[in-house]
Amino acid sequence: MKLSNELFHRSSKDHGGKSRICLDSSEDTYPPHSSSPPSFQKRLSFSDFSTTRLFSPPFLSKRSNNSPHRFSYSPPQHPASINSRRVASYTVQSSPSRTTYRQLPNEPQNSAAYTTYSSFPNALFDDFSPNNPLDTDPFLTSPGNKQNTVDSFRPLPETPVSPGGSLVHPLPRPPLPSSVSSHSSPYSTTSSTSLYSLYNDISLSCSPEPYLPLSPTRSPARTPSPIRLYSSDALRPQSPLSPSVEYLTPPNPYSLKSDISSTRQLPKIPVQDYASGKISSPLITRTHRRAQSETLFSSCREPWLVGKLYKWCKEEVFTALGGLVHEGVSRREVAQVMATLFTIHIASMEFLIAEIIAKNILGDWINYGLVEVINLEKLQIAFTSNEPPSGSGVLPFLTNGGCYSYICRSRSCPSKYQCYSCRCARNSSLEFTSLPGQSSDTWSIFWNISSLNSLPSSLSKREIARQNNIHELICKESDYVADLNTLAELFRDGIVQQQDAIVPSNRVADFIQSVFGNVESIRQLHSRLFLPQLIMRERLQGPVVSIIGDILLEWIHAAKSSYINYAKQFPLADETYKLECQRNTYFARWLAACRSDPRCRRLDFQHFLQRPTQRLQRYTLELDTILKHTEQSSWDFQLITQAVKELRATCEECDAVIATVLEANRIRDLSYQLLFKNHESVNLELRDPEREFFFEGIVQRRSDSRLDWLDIHLFLLDNYLIMAKARKDKRTNASRYVVSKRPIPLDLLVLSPKMDDFQLKSNTNKFLGSLAGNLPQESLTTKSKRKSKVNLELMFDATAEKNNENSMNSAVFEKSQLYPFTIRHLGAYTASYTLYVESLQLRKLWVEKINVAKKRHSQKINIKNPFALKVVSDVAFQYPPSDLVNGNEPLNSFNEITLVEGSSIDRALNEVAWKHPIVSEELLPEPIAYGDISCIAQFNDYEGHVSVLIATSTGIFLGAFGDSSDIRDWKKISSQRRVTQLGVVEEFDILLELRDKTLYAHKLSRIIEMGLIESKIAVVIGTPHAVSFFKIGKLSEGASVKRERTLVFYKEGLGNTTTIICCEPVIGLGHNYQKTYAFKRKDVTSFRTLDDFHVTANCHSIDCFKYSIALCHNKGIDVLRLDPKLAVGFPSPSVLNDTLFRNRINNSKPLGVFRIHDPSLFACCYQFGAVFVNGEGSMVNKECWFDWIGKPNSVTSCHGYLIAFNDEFVEIWNTRTRKLNQIIQGNDIKYYPSNSDWLANGKYIMFGMVHPQYHDRHLILALNKAKTNSFIIED
């Protein structure tokens, strides 16, 4: 790709009354010089334009052909003769809406119609007169003067050249009258030390010229293009400014919503009104901050003086933008204000050029310490306390109204001639024309730099490589913009503008929106903002570009949202166009025909559609290359580093967005493709917008007969793992998947940590199709196909196989290897599946994906969990040595349930790790007890804290439970063994202990004081060695006067005939009611038996209510009322009349009866599920029941939830909605009841399991009610 280097060279040509400036024009106003120019040894710098010099035309001077700035004119080429190589050209066109200095020959001269308000600084002084002889160019005569029309095409004089060959600039204007200060005039001949005179003695590699619009002089052939990108249109306001408005909120100068063919409409207002502050600027006022631009711009009447400009920006602009020293203001906003000031003083200057120059000025101020960067990420700057040196120089492009030509700045009537200066800022108008290109010149060829010039020798190899990289970035960006134009104009507009309907009219609008919806925003962003700024930066600073990171950083800030939106829609666009190709053959043929268009370069539509996503990734590579050749001490290095960082973050976000959309599309497809056998169905919740798709693939599984291999399509979602078999629909040939096994919820999915080595695939062998674990000594060499006869062949001898192992075909050997992994389905549908994949890497990938899915699922449901877990004890209690396998494993590793990251148990352990860290397994604290934990009791101590009693096979231990307690501080208070049950009656200061089937009553306060249980002074309740269990409850009695009584129920007897005895504590004489340890100290001397009940069944649990108790036995549930004495079966016979419930209840063990959220309803819990009945035992409706996920051993109720405990998991159900809310997985789970349905400050549900990290230790947990739950019900 070739880029034009003559941005500021102009020629004029008339086209039907319109003025056009084109590099290809054959009617150049200024013919080339015939004399050979002298040698030009060095590149122009600011030393050539000191404070006492004005602009001279360096590109029209006599220079040698070896000069890097040599200029050559080429005749216009016919379009047919233009090289077909893909090039990109940039032409310059004047804006038709702007006032000009030309008069067409056939138009009458009208001074009123062609009144031009001078925009150079002298127009502000009273003594300025356009008729002043000093303001007239002696070599150009106005066309209005008929006496001089013959000399109108007279060439301009050559720039004077000194005898030594160096360029000599024209003499400056004579000084102004003494009444005008020399500092206020741009023509003052007083020399002073300039800030920019530092460029005079610095080498070219360290002296960028950010303000000189230098450009190379080579002019390659240009190809006209219908694609025009008006950069100036996007950078200026689109509507005229109303002078009557005092405060304005203008459109963004970088707005991308303007029409592409519109031009910048400047207000027809004299520039003096801007400078005097009579009206407001259209670019300075922000939406949330009103700044009076009349005061702001009128305070800077001499913007060409660098010192005055810096003072104005520091004192006026920084304050007007609301900047704070510690926060700063946006560099872009300051640059826009400065650019607005420049365009006010030079009304015809392009805003893009003015803004780039303003940014270059700010960059130099940063380098010299006058401005500091507060926030590099947002490019926030602040002005320092440093001041520029006196006489810090001028800005030549603002002097003399933007041009040093007298006739250009002084004539008040229009002229048909362009200004001869290639750097005239008054006639700068940009129009970029771009065509795709296949090749590009290097930086040295582009700037016509040869090895004979002094420039390459003054630059290091690293800097030369950097300049090549920057130029390559601009070339590729031009190609990218051309491809975006092709996508928008050839394909999108072609579909709409085609006479024959390519896409049916009823869906063409949706098609355009789905495929091309976000193309235009990216196209406008690059063609109107990013690419023009890159080209302008290269022209203004070239051939050595000193800084480019600021443009990149501002671009990525503006482009981030557009690319994310494009990435979000890209999967839909790709799917839509492919579907249209399948069902619309005319559209497919049209796309194929478009490939012959030169703009397509034989590339298909898919290439252009995915161009933005691919280009975004390639930016990082190109910027990394530029960064590698950039000095780390430079400011540009910091800017590019920040741009690369944000670019990579944008790429990652785009990848995540695309992945999310692809997952959503795949889930949508699965909702139509999944089929269940035998009309079975599981609600997979595929319509849930939060559903996530993680992975899918084909695995193999042995058939139930273990004779065949089955291909299983595995789908991994964030809630289920689905195993299905692929099937083709015979009618539509669409893919369908028949679910072969019941989908596994991730809450019930267990991935076995133990994985065998690879196995050899074989259909049958003499062991009925079993697979060998490693390299087999005997294995089958042939496979039997399904429904074929079994072929048993001779086995290889082990020795022969070992000898021939190296000579085996590795491809065949690898193909027969399979790598297994095992998954388990917990619950009522418990099952284990061993799946096989073809490689070790694929097995690792599946394991990783399953763990990630379980982690993500745990994180999503954590906020919905009604209970959190608190650790009561982590490593204090150890399993008995007889239970340990291999020294330290108390469980089968094959059935082990591993810890899931982000689960409730993982969060509880992480919370403990902060307070009680364990550095390594070698530093694990020693256990305080060995043996199984039989029971746990809890009570409130004298400070109101919860204390816990834990009975093991080696004794009883006392500890504290709470946020401030030490979970490893346990005190042994008894060495008695065979303790099976503990209970506390806080009101009577009693601890009940069931040991060796004998029920003992101890004084709790004495145990706490002594730290020891004294068995000799304990009170025995009931018949020794005959008590099976006990239960503590508080019941009410009496019809008129309600009185609560604390009762103790215990069971005596064995076999089918048992007796339930009810007793209460008896308080002896001399009791006192002093509150000690939060107990009412009532000296209980004995227990009095109140009543007994004979049950002709084996009773195993008792549940107490306000007026009655429920007895659970092997024949069902009986409810006994104490006053009056009455027993009734529960639930009522009406429920048992239903065959469904009768079979379920009769074949299931009752686990308890609990009051739920509604006080009038009770939950009768069995091993199969729960049935909700009223006080009479009747069901409210047929839907008042549910089945457990597993087969629980015990059930309890807490805060309106039913909690069922299984050996491998805990399931928590909401009694209001009858839905499963939480599942907690674990190994060897055991529930430890409190043996009391009433405690003073409530009760905690405590249970234990094998520690998931240290398998020889007990982990005791307590359910803690979450604060986010909507209701709390006390039992």
Swiss-Prot record:
SUPFAM superfamilies: DBL homology domain (DH-domain), PH domain-like. Coiled coil: none annotated. The modification Phosphoserine is found at residue 293. InterPro entries: CNH_dom, DBL_dom_sf, DH_dom, PH-like_dom_sf, PH_5, PH_domain, Rho-type_GEFs. Keywords: Cell cycle, Cell division, Cytoplasm, Guanine-nucleotide releasing factor, Phosphoprotein, Septation. Signal peptide: none annotated. The keyword Phosphoprotein applies. Transmembrane segments: none annotated. Residues 1-42, 56-113, 131-188, 214-248 are annotated as: Disordered. GO terms for molecular function: guanyl-nucleotide exchange factor activity; lipid binding. Residues 930-1239 form the CNH domain. SMART domains: CNH (SM00036), PH (SM00233), RhoGEF (SM00325). It is found in: Cytoplasm. Pfam families: CNH (PF00780), PH_5 (PF15405), RhoGEF (PF00621), WH_RGF3 (PF23582). Residues 32-42, 80-113, 142-151 have a biased composition (Polar residues). Residues 692-855 form the PH domain. One of its GO terms (cellular component) is medial cortex. Residues 465-657 form the DH domain. Residues 178-188, 214-228 have a biased composition (Low complexity). The keyword Cell division applies. Residues 7-17 have a biased composition (Basic and acidic residues). Stimulates the exchange of Rho1 GDP-bound form into GTP-bound form. Regulates, via interaction and activation of Rho1, beta-1,3-glucan biosynthesis and cell wall integrity during septation. Involved in the regulation of contractile ring assembly. This is Rho1 guanine nucleotide exchange factor 3. The lineage of its organism: Eukaryota, Fungi, Dikarya, Ascomycota, Taphrinomycotina. The gene is rgf3.
